[in-house]
Amino acid sequence: MKRVIYKTIFCGLTLLTSLSSCSLDPKGYNLETKNSRDLNQESVILKENRETPSLVKRLSRRSRRLFARRDQTQKDTLQVQANFKTYAEKISEQDERDLSFVVSSAAEKSSISLALSQGEIKDALYRIREVHPLALIEALAENPALIEGMKKMQGRDWIWNLFLTQLSEVFSQAWSQGVISEEDIAAFASTLGLDSGTVASIVQGERWPELVDIVIT
């Protein structure tokens, strides 16, 4: 009788154990039940993960196109032809005042003063940027005060380098537009007592800093 009772109890415990095991995974951890909301969220996350690389690629291509357009716009701006004066026109009194103002400012003013005066300096530079390159250099060479100012600028590296860079860009544009002729070079060299062959070589090679050096030394 006792054996039957023990057997019945054992079978019952076995049944309860088997039922409870249905809520456990093989490793003994509780399985989490997921509702439809959780499943939908996981679906969205997986979809986003799949779409993210393609989105990044699209944005990258769009950025490259944007910067390419900007770069082309900048190039187009640089290629716009300037209305340079001829060498025979020389420079006007206003041009001389503007040139003196730019040189004296760059030679004498402190960095703070230059920053405060940058609007006036830019206006003066804009007005003289279309002066014929050789006429501009000739005006520098024939004015002792300007030569002295240029020498002071040489002692201020960043200002001098900036000046030469800007001057070279404008002069190279003039050369590319055919503004500087062989006759201009010959007349310029004759006026300043320079060798025309040397000047021609410098101009044709667009070695503008060298041209500045030979007229202020």
Curated annotation (Swiss-Prot):
Origin superkingdom: Bacteria
Signal peptide: 1-21
Topological type in the membrane: Lipid-anchor
PROSITE patterns: PROKAR_LIPOPROTEIN
Keyword tags: Cell membrane, Lipoprotein, Membrane, Palmitate, Signal
GO annotations of cellular component type: plasma membrane
Localization: Cell membrane
Lipidation residue positions, type S-diacylglycerol cysteine: C22
Keyword Signal annotated: yes
Lipidation (N-palmitoyl cysteine): C22
Family according to the record: Belongs to the chlamydial CPn_0875/CT_734/TC_0107 family.
Protein name as catalogued: Probable lipoprotein CPn_0875/CP_0994/CPj0875/CpB0904
The organism of origin for this protein: Chlamydia pneumoniae (Chlamydophila pneumoniae)
